[in-house]
Structure formats: C-alpha cells, structure tokens
C-alpha cells in the first residue's frame, strides 16, 4: 500500500500491479499505471536506502542524469514533478522513472564494445565539466580503512578469522 500511496501522492494513478525488481542497495519496483498516464503503462520506482545518501547527493545525481539525457545519451532520467525528481512519502525517499526496455551488450562483439566505450567516454566528458559537491568520494580511507576498522572494532568477524583478516587487510590497504 505504501508504494501505491506514494505514487498517488505525486499524482500518478497505479492500478495495483506491482513487481519487485533486482537492486543491490535500494528497493526498486515496477508499477503498472492507469491507461491515461503520460508516462506509459509502467513506471519504475526507486526507494532510497535510509541514511545512505543525502538528499543533496541524490538530487545532484538526478541533475547529472537529466543533463546526460538532454545530450541524448542512452539512459533513463527520473521523472520531474513539481520541479523535483526526489519525493518523500511517510519518511521514504523515492524517485520515479519511465520503464525502458533494453538488453546487455555483447562484449565479445567489437562494435557493441566500441559503442559502450564511446558512451562511457561521453559520460565521463560531461561529468568532468564540474565538481560533484555532495557525492561521497571514493577513497581508500573511507571505503578501505574505515570499513576495516569498523569490522574489527565491532567484532563482526568470526574469532578464528580476525587475525588473518586484520593482517591481510592491513597489507592490502598500505
């Protein structure tokens, strides 16, 4: 009900048809809409994991995605309603995307590989124009050292693996 209610809160009319989609970090659903929807028969709704990203980081990512879409890169940008792409319903943050079919490229096919490489190059060229202010930086300190310390300090590892993990990760991170 929460999923359907959140879509109704932004003016969409779901039929009740709902399928959970695979996602590593967030909760993502395909939702069927009433026939009169301007977004087609289905949308994909992404609910962001609490406390993982700030609103500013999500909106910055959405703005970048919209910029890429305006430059005709092959991607799906979030739907904008009332001048925003990030919505909140009962303390759940979410974005809505048009559903778009596709398929994985055949990386053994030279032409597919070249198209993918050119597309990634274009994305990086657009992203290099400005500094992203709100997205956490990828760093050995944040993703390596801090994670290592957290696991060791909070006894998350089986006792018999702790010494080996400590030694190995110290060697890898230094």
Located regions from the model:
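Conserved beta-strand edge residues that scaffold enzyme active sites
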Residues: 21, 82-83, 134-137
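Short, non-transmembrane alpha-helical segments in secretory-pathway proteins
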Residues: 1-13
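A cross-family kinase active-site recognition segment
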Residues: 106-164
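Short, P/G- and charge-enriched loop/turn segments at secondary-structure junctions
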Residues: 16-17, 84, 173-174
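ATP-binding glycine-rich phosphate-binding loop
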Residues: 10-32
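ATP-binding pocket architecture of kinase catalytic cores
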Residues: 32-132
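Short, conserved active-site entrance elements at the starts or edges of catalytic domains
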Residues: 161-174
């Amino acid at each position: 009900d929460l999923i359907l209610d959140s879509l109704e809160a932004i003016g969409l009319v779901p039929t009740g048809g709902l399928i959970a989609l695979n996602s590593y970090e967030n909760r993502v659903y395909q939702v069927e809409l009433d026939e009169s929807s301007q977004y087609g028969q289905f949308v994909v709704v992404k609910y962001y994991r609490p406390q993982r990203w700030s609103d500013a980081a999500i909106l910055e990512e959405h703005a970048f995605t919209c910029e890429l879409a305006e430059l005709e890169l092959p991607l799906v940008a979030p739907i904008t309603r009332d001048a925003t792409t990030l919505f909140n319903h009962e303390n759940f943050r979410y974005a809505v995307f048009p559903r778009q079919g596709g398929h994985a490229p055949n990386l053994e096919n030279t032409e597919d590989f070249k198209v993918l490489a050119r597309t990634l190059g274009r994305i990086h060229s657009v992203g290099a124009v400005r500094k992203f202010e709100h997205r956490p930086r990828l760093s050995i300190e944040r993703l390596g050292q801090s994670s290592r310390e957290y696991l060791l300090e909070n006894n998350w590892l089986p006792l018999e693996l702790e010494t080996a993990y400590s030694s190995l990760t110290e060697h890898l991170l230094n």
